[in-house]
Amino acid sequence: MKIFGTDGVRGKAGVKLTPMFVMRLGIAAGLYFKKHSKTNKILIGKDTRKSGYMVENALVSALTSIGYNVIQIGPMPTPAIAFLTEDMRCDAGIMISASHNPFEDNGIKFFNSYGYKLKEEEEKAIEEIFHDEELLHSSYKVGESVGSAKRIDDVIGRYIVHLKHSFPKHLNLQSLRIVLDTANGAAYKVAPVVFSELGADVLVINDEPNGCNINEQCGALHPNQLSQEVKKYRADLGFAFDGDADRLVVVDNLGNIVHGDKLLGVLGVYQKSKNALSSQAIVATSMSNLALKEYLKSQDLELKHCAIGDKFVSECMQLNKANFGGEQSGHIIFSDYAKTGDGLVCALQVSALVLESKQVSSVALNPFELYPQSLINLNIQKKPPLESLKGYSALLKELDKLEIRHLIRYSGTENKLRILLEAKDEKLLESKMQELKEFFEGHLC
């Protein structure tokens, strides 16, 4: 049975993520990390979901039962776990979060001792241990060999200092009014402190988590409220994070949501202007707009494509010796400062770009026009191989004939089919999207 999806393990808490399942997974992961153990410490953080307590306690029980010492740091962004795992010399880091999913879901993400997400072969190795009944039951420790657990509440300061170091030292935010939407999630403490300490005039919304309101009509998936607040307070910028703050959505001074591909383009060129790029390559996923590639080419930069998921962006960046890349969804990686997508690092870089451009954000963050794209997430009941659907191949051939770029795939974390179309003719695009929607509703719903 495959346990890992595109971003760790994710599912409904109490259904897939039961205490027994989580304990078994924790033991399997712990045994895998033991093979390369240097410090016998594992770091655990979480977002603000109510079920995080259950998952955390199950993981602590599992890891201490096989001799690991566990450090619990409470609600923190996913990129903070990646950073602190390496900074605190831990064998591994674990983030308990289902990212942008509703509060009923939860998930578990693993990081190696260097703060990188696990590769697929590492996940497969953990899955093999998970299914090895004899190995699991022979691994419990007794007496003094049982591990310990301690909670540390002040590590947030380390991450805040790290974030501030990512911001250019010759700048401050005193001239900017910024609205932050922390999605009632993991960034609710960190984000306001960072921006306030750098001098910004800060308004914070959705910063009162109650365990059940994470991502609820707020944050990166629902930026309309942020857009309204930016216009209401005449702010210079608005930043919306998702539940674990590895994703960022930007709103300009006019209340417009800045497209992720425009953000990738303008940030890439900004990094180049500072001689901050380690290569001429910038990494984006196959979902990126063709206009991004053309814009980067005009700036003597090359776009490298990879599979969807910030883990694959990171791997492709390492392969191409690149230090900047991301997804149009808002997972953007500045690997000089973060091994995974970090919404806060990205927000600070966007702020610096706007300051140094000496333009309002609606101008500074609008460097090129995009080709028309349409993206829908279709709720489905089943996930048969797409190639097995009668008429599917003919549909793709027709799209190719009409020069409509297409990307159709199942979500790795939810029962959804993602359909992306791109074409120069917007009316044709809308017509074909409706046709595809009806086709898949008839076969999968």
Curated annotation (Swiss-Prot):
Mg(2+) binds at residues 99, 242, 244, 246. One of its GO terms (molecular function) is phosphoglucosamine mutase activity. The modification Phosphoserine is found at residue 99. Its cofactor is Mg(2+). It catalyses: alpha-D-glucosamine 1-phosphate = D-glucosamine 6-phosphate. The keyword Hydrolase does not apply. Binds 1 Mg(2+) ion per subunit. The active site is at 99 (phosphoserine intermediate). Keywords: Isomerase, Magnesium, Metal-binding, Phosphoprotein. GO terms for biological process: carbohydrate metabolic process; peptidoglycan biosynthetic process; UDP-N-acetylglucosamine biosynthetic process. Activated by phosphorylation. SUPFAM superfamilies: Phosphoglucomutase, C-terminal domain (SSF55957), Phosphoglucomutase, first 3 domains (SSF53738). It comes from the Bacteria. It holds the Pfam family PGM_PMM_III. The keyword Protein biosynthesis does not apply. GO terms for cellular component: cytosol. Its EC number is 5.4.2.10. Belongs to the phosphohexose mutase family. Catalyzes the conversion of glucosamine-6-phosphate to glucosamine-1-phosphate. NCBIfam families: glmM. This is Phosphoglucosamine mutase. It comes from Helicobacter pylori (strain Shi470).
